[in-house]
Amino acid sequence: MVLLWALFLALLAGAHAELPGCKIRVTSAALDLVKQEGLRFLEQELETITIPDVYGAKGHFYYNISDVRVTQLHLISSELHFQPDQDLLLNISNASLGLHFRRQLLYWFLYDGGYINASAEGVSIRTGLQLSQDSSGRIKVSNVSCEASVSKMNMAFGGTFRRMYNFFSTFITSGMRFLLNQQICPVLYHAGTVLLNSLLDTVPVRSSVDDLVGIDYSLLKDPVVSNGNLDMEFRGAFFPLKEDNWSLPNRAVEPQLEDDERMVYVAFSEFFFDSAMESYFQAGALQLTLVGDKVPSDLDMLLRATYFGSIVLLSPTVINSPLKLKLEATSPPRCTIKPSGTTISITASVTITLAPPMLPEVELSKMIMEGRLSAKLTLRGKALRVKLDLRRFQIYSNQSALESLALIPLQAPLKTLLQIGVMPLLNERTWRGVQIPLPEGINFVREVVTNHAGFVTVGADLHFAKGLREVIDKNRPADVAASHVPPPSAAAA
């Protein structure tokens, strides 16, 4: 009985789980590129290590090592890979750090000072980044694990007191090695929890697309990591800006990601596009009104000839009034994605009136228009763009079949009007595109779009248009002092 009840609860939870409208998979093919940029950033961060002065005395000898700074990082072996428990794991072994510091020695009244170069050999670093969603649905680095060790220090002293320095080198090098061990992990913890999170803050969560609608890319759950991929599920829903709490139930097919040859894959369900069209419909954007000289002259003449019998019976003050043509969607358009292509179906009303100045409009006809558009998706940079093309068009009257027959001569000119006057306006808006949830400075290249039953996938490679350092410095938090200190378990002596 208990097992049946648990099964029922599991099924109930699954039934109410929100389906993603957008999925992103980062594959292991992207890790080499990420590692190159990440190691460059890591090298710059390790150069910020601050080592306290090392000083002491033995008998009448006093020594002081100060102004220690890291000058360079040499990597012999490094590996970045996915790991289910740690999400992203970086292993660095047999690396070396170049150091530059000031030396001072006092023996009785004899003093020696100057600057010297040293190296930390056998540097090993093992650090893991754990990714999760925060309360706003944004992806974050929630934890950084770190183990670091330096096996030995090399210093080459010279000058008059070289033998004295060599005598104290054991004390000096062991002290500096201990301090260096203690400083590596705090730097990496700060780099992950503060600096990398400032980069992730550039990923859009709820942002405006234009002055009418916005897009919600909230994560629905924590990222899922396997040995070869990092998978993320986003809400992927548009909404009218004037109705921030508006939502559309997602009953579309859940998009699936199965490939792993390219660096990244993005999948969009029919819901993603349906929510966009529903949002524009709710915002009142799916309508167009042409009055007077905005109506093509050929179409104006044809319409007046078609409805001559009705116009001639009107008042002389109305007969020569400007013609008004209003197209308005009667319901939100719907998207259908098949392996053969993507289509959008739309139903609209076409109202033809005479609009005399300062007088009520006179309706000549009201008809129903049904259209089918083909949609071609492309991804440029990190903007998803759509180009629409009118494939099928018909008009009819919902009053009588006889009136529908009378509308046949209007079908060709109205279709031409849509192709010349309406489609360019739609494509101007859709070609602006909507941003994909990627951090600033990272773009898609070499995109391949593939249609499936109910969803579309885009496979692409990644390109760093900006370096991590450039983006992080631009978005660095003003006060990060509290994040410099990692948990006690993060640093290994």
Swiss-Prot record:
SMART domains: BPI1, BPI2. Keywords: Disulfide bond, Glycoprotein, Lipid transport, Nucleus, Secreted, Signal, Transport. It catalyses: a 1,2-diacyl-sn-glycero-3-phosphocholine(in) = a 1,2-diacyl-sn-glycero-3-phosphocholine(out); a 1,2-diacyl-sn-glycero-3-phosphoethanolamine(in) = a 1,2-diacyl-sn-glycero-3-phosphoethanolamine(out); a 1,2-diacyl-sn-glycerol(in) = a 1,2-diacyl-sn-glycerol(out); a 1,2-diacyl-sn-glycero-3-phosphate(in) = a 1,2-diacyl-sn-glycero-3-phosphate(out). It comes from Mus musculus (Mouse). Glycosylation is necessary for secretion and its phospholipid transfer activity. The gene is Pltp. One of its GO terms (biological process) is ceramide transport. Disulfide bonds join 146-185. Glycans are attached at residues 64, 91, 94, 117, 143, 245, 398. It holds the Pfam family LBP_BPI_CETP_C. One of its GO terms (cellular component) is extracellular region. This is Phospholipid transfer protein.
